Regions:
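Hydrophobic alpha-helical segments and helix pairs
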Residues: 1-20
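Mature-chain termini and adjacent capping regions
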Residues: 1-2, 27-34, 57-59, 146, ...
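Gly/Pro-enriched, hydrophobic low-complexity segments
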Residues: 7, 16, 24-31, 45-142
């Protein structure tokens, strides 16, 4: 059951850890694939899989704590196999590796991720219960909607 206390997240908190994971709030909310500056910088194999490296930079008027993001895109399945997020000095701040890809209805989906964050933190994310075609209403993402959430069966959370 979700907690009864709610906290707004401001710009200053966007770099903070999301629920103690190696991801930040910004990693969940902002997609570098939507940034205006996109450049293919070359090919590289990832574990024997041919990839194209896409470099993304936030355009004018877009605020991000990352100066650039590089994504290794599987050329055949069009799935990011690695994402590296860089600070303004060019240092990798966060690396996300796709460890399992699922073929679902003709689409390839990254379902298991390993996230390497600041300070050596590592988080494994599994999409073993991933469902497609699920619809959500805007009200599901309100404070009232979050109070109605139930933990998935078998998640270990009390219901």
């Amino acid at each position: 059951m979700p907690p009864n206390n709610l906290k707004s997240i401001g710009a200053a908190e966007m770099k903070q850890s999301l629920f103690g994971s190696a991801l930040s709030y910004e990693d969940i909310i902002d997609s570098p694939f939507t940034w205006t500056q996109q450049t293919i910088v070359g090919p590289e194999d990832m574990d024997g899989t041919p990839c194209q490296i896409l470099e993304s930079k936030p355009g004018k008027g877009h605020t991000s704590s990352y100066s650039s993001v590089k994504s290794w895109i599987d050329s055949r399945r069009l799935v990011p196999l690695r994402i590296e997020k860089y600070d303004s000095s060019g240092k990798v701040v966060r690396r996300i590796n796709t460890t399992r890809v699922l073929l679902e209805g003709g689409d390839s989906l990254p379902v298991d991720l390993k996230v390497y964050g600041p300070g050596g933190s590592v988080t494994h994310i599994t999409g073993s219960r991933l469902k497609r075609g699920v619809s959500y209403a805007d009200t599901d993402f309100t404070p009232e909607g979050f109070k109605l959430l139930n933990a998935p069966p078998g998640s270990g959370s009390s219901e």
